[in-house]
């Protein structure tokens, strides 16, 4: 059951709401415009608030639904977390879009919401505060994601290793943003 759900989570994660919504509405492909990222922040820049919110919610659901299904199937918390990681991997490397996806922040937030809601709340609050102070989405994500690890280590240690792997993946996907941050070229709102 674990492997079946892991594969299905990856396939669900491979659905890119940013790309699909752009195609449906005649907006530019987010991978080819703006920051080049197929995610909610770039959709905000390219297509406005409505499509950005729809992208955010869709991407979060891609992380949340597989975890909830795994929970209903009786899988352990660690297995649920790994299934969530598979959904995020689908978002990062989508099968349907030549493996060029987003950065995984919203999908990881959805996964975290299913695993341990207080950690998701902490991540969202940290992201909002960091974004408010810096007006930089990538920096907010790089601050918020690792902050969940101590809380998980304390409350849900079974999810710590999968979430640590996910954190490393998200930081790796932001490596260009890190270069731009250090060079003073990162885009702000």
Curated annotation (Swiss-Prot):
It is a multi-pass membrane protein. Its EC number is 2.3.1.275. The keyword Transferase applies. GO terms for cellular component: plasma membrane. It comes from the Bacteria. GO terms for biological process: phospholipid biosynthetic process. It holds the Pfam family G3P_acyltransf. It is an enzyme of class 2 (transferase). Belongs to the PlsY family. This is Glycerol-3-phosphate acyltransferase. It comes from Pseudomonas fluorescens (strain SBW25). The gene is plsY.
């Amino acid at each position: 059951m674990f492997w079946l759900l892991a594969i299905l989570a990856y396939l669900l994660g491979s659905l890119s709401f940013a790309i699909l919504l752009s195609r449906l509405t005649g907006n530019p492909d987010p991978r080819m415009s703006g920051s080049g990222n197929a995610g909610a922040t770039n959709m905000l820049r390219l297509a406005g608030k409505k499509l950005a919110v729809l992208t955010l919610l869709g991407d979060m659901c891609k992380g949340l639904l597989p975890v909830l299904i795994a929970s209903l199937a009786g899988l352990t918390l660690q297995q649920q977390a790994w299934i969530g990681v598979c959904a995020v991997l689908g978002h990062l490397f989508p099968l349907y879009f030549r493996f060029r996806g987003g950065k995984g922040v919203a999908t990881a937030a959805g996964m975290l919401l299913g695993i341990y809601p207080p950690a998701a709340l902490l991540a969202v609050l940290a992201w909002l505060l960091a974004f408010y102070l810096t007006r930089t989405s990538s920096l907010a994500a790089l601050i918020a994601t690792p902050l969940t690890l101590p809380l998980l280590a304390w409350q849900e240690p079974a999810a710590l290793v999968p979430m640590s792997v996910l954190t490393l993946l998200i930081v790796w996907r932001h490596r260009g943003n890190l270069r731009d941050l250090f060079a003073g070229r990162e885009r702000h709102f």
